[in-house]
Amino acid sequence: MNFPLFTGCATALITPFLPDGRLDEPALRRLLAMQTAAKMDALVLLGTTGEPCTLSMDERERIIEIGLECTGGSIPVIVGTGSNDTRRAIEYARQAQRLGAAGQLSVTPYYNKTTQSGLIRHYHAILDACPLPMILYNVPGRTGMGLSADTAAALSRHPSVVGLKEASGNSTLTGEILEKTRRELPIYCGNDDQILPMMAQGSCGAISVVSNILPDKTRALTRACLERRMDDAQALQLELMPLIRALFLQVSPIPVKAALAMMGLIHDELRLPLVQMDEPYRSRLKQALLDARLLS
């Protein structure tokens, strides 16, 4: 049995920047305070939502340090360590372990795609070099390749593999993974619009974008699912759907950073090649925030 790092809801936190492009440490601390106040079950730093591909090793270190300082050990802090260079992924994993992270989230290699056997060798190489507990991350829409159910089952036998963030949007694949791993590999929903159906199917939680905006309600949705209060879960999922749709009008994290800026929590700054949200999408996002009573 692979024991999960958490059950419930983890926020895939954004990385705030100043207008001059530097890391906005005060804003990061505000966001972390908002998450801890909502009693989130875990936090993911430097995941896709955190723009890790445009951060230096020093910036990564500072973000992890602040995350661990602000949470004070109250919840697991999981660090995104994925790379399409296995050697770099090992460096990221060792950094996260050295600083005290509870675990790592490792996306399948992108662009220079590999085979399923290559995926197994990639992940085993990382874990042989650094056994920091790992949540695998399957998001073929971004990486261009997917993790098969057989590969997930093979990797689940490694003692340091403690979960899978499944963001393919393929419920059949989720079912196959649950079947082939005998439900012993914890699976986390990686798509906010599918939290209820995936948790009803057997997932143990979610790694969420919308929880950057509404951490309390997103966590309440996952708790309702875990406690099998499906009427409550359905109501919460439906309540969140308009905002979820708005947060994916353009490529994430562009909309979620625009939303947080409208709420006065951060500057609306991203690092190229990401750019600020276009019209008419920005107006639609603002209306969704108004409808959710997050703006006045």
What is each stretch, according to the model?
Residues 3-11, 16-144:
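Active-site beta->alpha loop and helix N-cap motifs at the rims of alpha/beta catalytic domains
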Residues 5-15, 34, 38-40, 49, ...:
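C-terminal alpha-helical cap/extension of soluble enzyme domains
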Residues 19, 25, 57, 149, ...:
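Alpha-helix N-capping/helix-start residues
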Residues 24, 85, 187, 249, ...:
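Charged, low-complexity surface patches
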Residues 28, 60, 64, 89, ...:
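A general structural signal for well-ordered alpha-helical segments in protein cores
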Residues 38, 62, 66-71, 95, ...:
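Alpha-helical structural signal in soluble globular domains
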Residues 55-58, 91, 116-119, 147-149, ...:
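Short secondary-structure transition/capping segments
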Residues 128, 140-248:
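Catalytic alpha/beta core domains of metabolic enzymes, predominantly
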